[in-house]
Every structure is written in structure tokens, then in C-alpha cells.
């Protein structure tokens, strides 16, 4: 049964603290620290009773407790309660007591945390969810998710041991205990900082403020407003305007659609509202708080579903969401807790029957639901979607929009950027952007066409493009609709422009090692589920090895040695580069979103390097063994430079394949479209053949020689040629290369240069990945 919001709010005082009970919520009473009203008495059951609303009044229900629940002196199973009710738990005379009274009426002039930009307009800070006294005898108040804390916060975004509030002679200090998502003071991450009255301590979805000797808790339940004020974005040194003075309010629990012709600034507005690319001028107020100023904290409460899927399509729905939960929740979150949350969002979005299916096998609408489920894991208050119905048929379009309507009704603010006008009627508000990034309309969807003077949306969009002289924005500003829906609905005063914002600190992430392990498991699972990729990975080294073996014959001779080594080089380059050349560009959207919520750049890259590196090295070993097994190598005295000849050649091929893999990652990070990777792979192979030293005389040729130093196959062929002393077997000018000498120093130089090239490529990939990150956090 859903709670009844028409019932009055009540204040319950129990166990030395007080809680204002919101009629839209259910309150659990018992010894369970995760409950809303916690009683520390052995006579009280773990789950003792429930307080909830029903048909406009409050209802007390006993949950089959051992020692009973007593209202006004008599034992009850369930009964109506209200202001003046006295409830005892566990014993009718001296059991823990809860007294109910009417909640104090919020006063607009009541003190609010000073770090809120506009306290009078905020909903979260209008009334504390709970008030807890801070006894001076206890100098440390421990805050976290674990039951043993002094202040238990039932939120998976909160670590089990999250923070401590320390009382000292000079006041209070907040100390972060190495939490997953961080502790924030007035929106900024802190490790240790002094707290004064009016400051906001942010922990998960909760905010705490000191008021005298009390700690007031304010919970962000998701019902938050958004106020957009005078956003402007300019490019080309101010010569071109993408957004021009965009202002509008978005109420709690509402669904807003943003439409407009191409080039009207829809994507620019989305980036500005989410904080990914802040506007050059103006402000975005999240429930009275400056989003850009407090972005480090508030970004955890923002969900963004891009147009492209943000999950690995080879994985099943349940498995993909499970890996996402491991990355987004604290490392100390129990597996059962994560799985419970995954199952909850799967059920909420109607995906229970599809949970074991691979994502790529789902319909477009179902895949979009999975992407939404990913964002709902962390219970965001604001949910943004970019073109969620793109490519869907009208039925699926309608289904997705009704899903978003339901998400808003459940207590979220949902903003969707779309080109589809089929289901605008389910939205509360519609924002129409005209070319130049100006507001042509904001208000109820049903009034939009009448305001423009058209009967169909295609006519309106054609007019936007054709009638460029018409002042669409000016007409709207002069209309009664602007006064009613923008000037009238906006509850927050104009926000003064602040100084330009620099990059914020990177999100406080799960431990680097924990992220790396999760990323490696997920990547290995995705690779193993891609059957086509597996077949290619297995077949390629055998095919190239067989070609090398056919050329080598039974022995490396004057006629076969150079060609056999060349084929090994080509095979290693193709194997390594083919493994990696698509891996970063195809995950561009996934990386951008995960980086924004705390993914470590280096852990992400290292997961690719380690998993692909292991696969590539195994392939290189197979390639060499197939190519040279049983072949007489004709090394001097049957020995290599430092080790047996076959071992040295295998090491050279493996290191070349690894370096080629790093080169493939570099190309994948460099390009913007997956389609161009295959032509570039062919080009890479040609360059390796030309500059390896097997076809052209490079030593002593100005320009070509220096250019060849950047080509991995040049050094790998040198190492292999040195192992067998190729100039001795093939005595010609081409093999009289200084890098082909059978000397330990030369062989080690060849191998060392492959390592150096790998490291340089890794550094370059890291810098290129930085380009894909949200602009506000690049550093």
C-alpha cells in the first residue's frame, strides 16, 4: 500500500532524538540500525513496528514483535495514532517511549545552512528529517552505514565507516575515514576540516548541519527542483552563440522535454545542466544550491543516460548491472546488498523476464531501460536522458516516455532531450529551443502549437528553419505564458555570476586495486562472450604461424630466413593491433559516463593492458611455436645471444605483439569513429613491413633511418636477426644492419626500445583518454 501524502506530518520523539515523519514515507521502529526510529533496548524486537499513513491519517502496526506494542496503555496490533499519542515498545509501563506531536510549521525565516544559495527556495533544507543531540561527553560521533556507528545512514552510497565528527575545545571537526564517495563540506571534498554553524556536511544523499548542540539531518529524497538562470555559451572567441540567456524553472517530480531543430543548442544545454560542460555565464541551482560550485558533491545525485548504450552489450542484463554496482558502490558493500539493489532496479523497470538475456539481444526500448536501470542504481534525484527514443518505432517511443513519466511520479525530476514529438503529452513541461539557443516556448505541451499558430509540429520546425528573421524568443518573452511559467513559477532569485570555474578534483573512487579487479573481470567476461572475436583471436596466430612455417621449411637458410622472420613480425603486429584497435573507441560513451562518476583513468587503461596483454602474449607464443617448431634455426653454435634461440625469438615476437597492442590502443584513443579503425589497421601493418628493415636499407639512409626508430617491428626484427646472426646466414647488404648484430648489447637495446615504445604509447593513450572526460574535471 502506498503512503498517503494527504496526512499531516508528525514529530516523533524517542530515545533522546526526534524525527519529523513525512507522510509520503514509511517509518520502521526497532533495534535495526537501518530503521528510521532506532530503539536501544533488549525488550524491543529487531523489526518491532511500523508507522505509515493510510487514507489521510497515521497508522501504527506491530510487526509480530516478541514483547508487544502499546498505544495509550493498551497492547495493539494496529491502531490509528496522531498528535498526543504515547507509544511504548516491549513493556506497557517502562518500555522505550515514543511521543507523537504535530510537526512544527516550517518558517520561511527559520535558520538554514548558510552554504545553501537560496535557503527559502530549497525543499531538502526546508525541514530536518531528524534532529540528534550531540552530548559533549561523547567527543567522537561516528557516521556510516554499519550498525556500530553512532549515526547510521542507510544509504549504499555511504561507506560502512564513513566519517567522524570530532568535538574539541574550539568547536567541531569533520574527518573523512577514506570513504568511497567522499565527505563534503559546503559542496567541496574534505579529508579533515573545521565545521561551524551553517555549514553543510554532505554524506551520500544526506546533509548534516550544526544547530547549537544538535546535529540536524536533511535527506535528499529525490524531490528536488532545478532553476536554470541566464545560461549562455559562446564559441569561436565569442563570435558564435550556442545558448543565449536560457532561463526556466523545473519543479519537483516533474518530466520536462526539450525539443528544437538541429543546431538549436539542445546538446549544449544538456551538457550545461549536467555540469559536464558548464555554461560560460549563468547558474544552475539544484534545490537552492549552485550546481557548478558544489559539483563535486552533487554530481553523485545526477543520472545521465546518453543516446548510445552505456553497458557492454555482450553481457547479460543482470551481470552488466552487477559489475556497474561493484564500481559505483563502496568497496565494503556486501554482495547481497549490491545484488538486492540490482534486483530492485530490474524489477522497477520491468526487466525481470530479461535479466538473463544478453543486452545485444534486447529490443531498442528494452536496451534503453537497461541504461536507465544503470543510472537508477545510485538513486539519483535528477535524471537526464539524451534522445532516449532515437531509432524506436512509435509504440516503443510511447513505452519509453511512459516509463519516464512513472520515474518522475515516483519522486525524481526527469529531463529528456528528444527529437520525437509523439509523446510530449505525458510531460509536465515542454521547452522549445529556437536556432541560436534561445527559448521559443516553455510551458505545458498542449499549449505549444497553439502559441506558435500551427496544428502540427513539422510545420513549426519548418518555420524555425525558414523564418530566420522572426524573433521567436522575443515573442515568447512578451507573452503571458512567459510571465506565468517562467517568471511566475521561478521561486529562486537571480543568482549573481561567480568567478570562472576551474576543474574540480577527480571523484573519490573505489580503491584503485578494487576498480582494476572489477574492470578486468568485466572486460574478460565481455571478451569471452564475443564469439566472433574469440574465433579471430584463436585462428589468427595459427594462420600466420602456418605461413611462417611454410616459408621456413626445415631450416632457416639463405632463401627462407629473412622471409620467415618477416612473417613472424607481420603476424605479431596484426595480432596485437587487431586485438586493441577498436577497444577504446567502441567504449567511448561508457568511459565518459563511468569517469564522471568516479572511474580511475589509469585503472581503466591498465585493465585493457593487462587483459589484452595476456591474450596477446599467449597468441605470440602460439604464433612462434607454430611457425618455428621443428625448424632448425641455424644460430651460431646452436645458441642465441643470451638464451636458447627459440626462447629469444619468442620473447621478441611477444614483446612486438604487446607493443603493437599498445599502438592499437593509441589509434583507438585517437580516432572518433569505429569505422576508420580497420583501414588504419591495414596501414599500420604496411608501415611495419616497410620500415622493419627486411625490404629497404634503412641504416645510413637519412630520414628513413630516424623514422624507423618509431616503428616497433624495426627493433623486433633486429632482435630476432641478432639471435640467429642473420648476416651470417644471408650475407648481403640489407642484412648488414647494426641492429642485426649477434651481440648482447645490441639485442638488449632492441628489446629495451620495444619496452620504451610501449611506455610512451601508454602515456599518450592516457593523455588522449583525458579528452573524453567531462570538461569540468579534466586535470
What are these regions (language model features)?
Residues 56, 71, 185, 282-290, ...:
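Conserved ABC transporter NBD signature motif
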Residues 454-457, 525-779:
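Membrane-spanning alpha-helical segments of multipass transporters and channels
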Residues 313-330:
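Q-loop/switch helix immediately C-terminal to the Walker
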Residues 337-354:
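Conserved ABC ATPase "signature" region
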Residues 375-377:
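ABC ATPase C-loop
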Residues 18-91, 133-205:
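Forkhead-associated
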Residues 274:
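Helix-to-loop junction immediately C-terminal to a conserved catalytic motif
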Residues 172, 180-181, 185-186, 196-200, ...:
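Topological signature of polytopic alpha-helical transporters
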Amino acid at each position: 500500500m502506498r503512503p498517503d501524502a494527504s496526512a499531516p506530518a508528525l514529530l516523533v520523539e524517542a530515545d533522546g532524538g526526534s524525527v519529523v515523519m513525512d507522510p509520503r514515507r514509511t517509518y520502521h521502529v526497532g533495534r535495526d540500525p537501518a530503521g528510521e526510529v532506532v530503539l536501544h533496548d533488549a525488550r524491543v524486537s529487531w523489526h518491532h513496528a511500523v508507522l505509515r499513513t493510510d487514507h489521510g491519517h497515521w497508522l501504527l502496526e506491530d510487526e509480530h514483535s516478541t514483547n508487544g506494542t502499546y498505544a495509550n496503555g493498551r497492547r495493539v496490533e494496529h491502531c490509528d495514532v496522531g498528535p498526543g499519542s504515547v507509544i511504548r515498545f516491549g513493556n506497557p509501563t517502562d518500555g522505550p517511549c515514543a511521543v507523537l506531536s504535530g510537526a512544527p510549521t516550517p518558517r520561511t525565516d527559520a535558520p538554514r545552512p548558510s552554504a545553501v544559495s537560496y535557503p527559502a527556495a530549497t525543499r531538502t533544507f526546508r525541514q530536518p528529517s531528524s534532529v540528534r543531540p550531540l552530548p559533549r561527553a561523547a567527543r567522537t560521533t561516528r557516521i556510516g552505514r554499519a550498525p556500530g556507528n553512532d549515526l547510521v545512514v542507510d544509504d549504499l552510497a555511504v561507506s560502512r565507516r564513513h566519517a567522524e565528527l570530532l568535538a574539541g575545545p574550539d568547536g567541531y571537526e569533520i574527518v573523512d575515514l577514506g570513504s568511497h564517495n567522499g565527505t563534503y563540506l559546503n559542496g567541496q571534498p574534505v579529508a579533515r576540516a573545521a565545521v561551524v554553524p551553517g555549514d553543510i556536511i554532505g554524506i551520500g544523499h544526506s546533509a548534516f548541519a550544526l544547530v547549537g548542540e544538535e546535529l540536524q539531518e536533511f535527506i535528499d529524497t529525490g524531490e528536488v527542483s532545478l532553476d536554470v538562470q541566464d545560461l549562455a555559451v559562446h564559441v569561436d572567441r565569442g563570435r558564435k552563440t550556442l545558448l543565449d540567456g536560457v532561463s526556466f524553472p523545473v519543479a519537483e517530480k516533474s518530466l520536462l522535454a526539450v525539443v528544437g531543430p538541429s543546431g538549436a543548442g539542445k546538446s549544449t544545454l544538456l551538457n550545461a545542466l549536467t555540469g559536464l560542460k558548464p555554461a560560460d555565464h549563468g547558474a544552475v541551482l539544484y534545490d537552492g544550491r549552485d550546481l557548478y560550485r558544489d559539483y563535486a558533491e552533487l554530481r553523485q545525485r545526477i543520472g545521465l543516460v546518453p543516446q548510445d548504450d552505456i553497458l557492454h552489450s555482450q553481457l547479460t542484463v543482470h551481470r552488466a548491472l552487477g559489475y556497474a554496482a561493484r564500481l559505483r558502490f563502496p568497496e565494503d558493500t556486501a554482495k547481497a546488498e549490491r545484488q538486492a539493489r540490482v534486483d530492485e532496479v530490474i524489477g522497477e523497470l520491468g526487466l525481470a523476464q530479461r535479466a538473463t538475456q544478453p543486452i545485444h539481444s534486447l529490443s531498442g526500448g528494452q536496451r534503453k531501460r537497461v541504461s536507465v536501470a544503470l543510472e537508477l542504481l545510485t538513486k539519483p534525484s535528477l535524471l537526464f536522458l539524451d534522445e532516449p527514443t532515437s531509432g524506436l518505432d512509435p509504440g516503443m517511443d510511447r513505452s519509453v516516455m511512459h516509463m519516464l513519466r512513472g520515474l518522475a511520479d515516483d519522486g525524481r525530476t526527469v529531463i529528456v532531450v528528444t527529437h520525437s514529438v509523439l509523446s510530449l503529452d505525458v510531460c509536465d513541461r515542454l521547452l522549445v529551443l529556437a536556432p541560436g539557443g534561445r527559448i521559443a516556448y516553455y510551458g505545458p505541451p498542449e499549449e505549444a502549437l497553439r502559441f506558435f499558430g500551427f496544428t502540427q509540429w513539422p510545420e513549426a520546425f519548418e518555420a524555425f528553419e525558414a523564418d530566420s528573421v522572426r524573433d521567436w524568443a522575443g515573442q515568447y518573452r512578451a507573452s503571458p505564458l512567459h510571465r506565468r511559467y517562467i517568471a511566475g513559477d521561478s521561486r529562486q532569485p537571480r543568482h549573481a555570476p561567480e568567478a570562472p570555474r576551474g576543474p574540480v578534483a577527480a571523484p573519490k573512487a573505489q580503491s584503485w586495486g578494487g576498480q582494476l579487479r572489477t574492470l578486468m573481470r568485466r572486460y574478460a567476461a565481455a571478451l569471452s562472450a564475443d564469439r566472433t572475436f574469440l574465433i579471430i583471436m584463436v585462428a589468427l596466430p595459427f594462420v600466420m604461424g602456418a605461413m611462417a612455417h611454410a616459408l621456413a621449411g626445415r631450416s632457416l637458410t639463405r632463401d627462407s630466413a629473412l622471409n620467415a622472420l618477416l612473417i613472424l613480425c607481420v603476424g605479431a603486429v596484426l595480432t596485437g593491433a587487431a586485438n586493441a584497435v577498436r577497444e577504446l573507441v567502441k567504449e567511448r560513451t561508457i568511459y565518459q559516463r563511468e569517469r564522471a562518476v568516479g572511474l580511475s583513468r589509469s585503472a581503466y587503461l591498465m585493465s585493457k593492458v593487462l587483459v589484452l596483454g595476456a591474450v596477446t602474449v599467449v597468441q605470440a607464443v602460439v604464433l612462434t611455436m607454430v611457425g618455428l617448431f621443428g625448424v632448425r634455426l641455424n644460430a651460431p653454435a646452436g645458441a642465441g645471444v643470451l638464451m636458447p634461440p627459440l626462447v629469444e625469438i619468442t620473447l621478441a615476437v611477444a614483446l612486438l605483439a604487446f607493443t603493437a597492442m599498445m599502438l592499437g590502443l593509441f589509434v583507438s584513443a585517437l580516432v572518433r569513429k569505429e569505422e576508420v579503425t580497420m583501414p588504419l589497421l591495414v596501414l599500420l601493418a604496411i608501415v611495419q613491413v616497410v620500415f622493419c628493415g627486411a625490404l629497404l636499407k634503412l641504416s645510413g639512409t637519412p630520414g628513413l633511418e630516424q623514422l624507423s626508430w618509431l616503428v616497433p617491428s624495426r627493433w623486433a626484427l633486429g632482435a630476432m636477426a641478432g639471435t640467429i646472426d642473420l648476416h651470417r646466414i644471408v650475407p648481403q647488404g640489407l642484412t648488414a644492419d647494426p641492429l642485426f648484430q649477434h651481440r648482447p648489447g645490441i639485442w638488449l637495446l632492441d628489446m629495451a626500445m620495444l619496452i620504451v615504445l610501449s611506455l610512451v604509447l601508454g602515456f599518450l593513450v592516457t593523455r588522449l583518454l583525458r579528452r573524453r572526460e567531462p570538461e569540468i574535471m579534466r586535470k
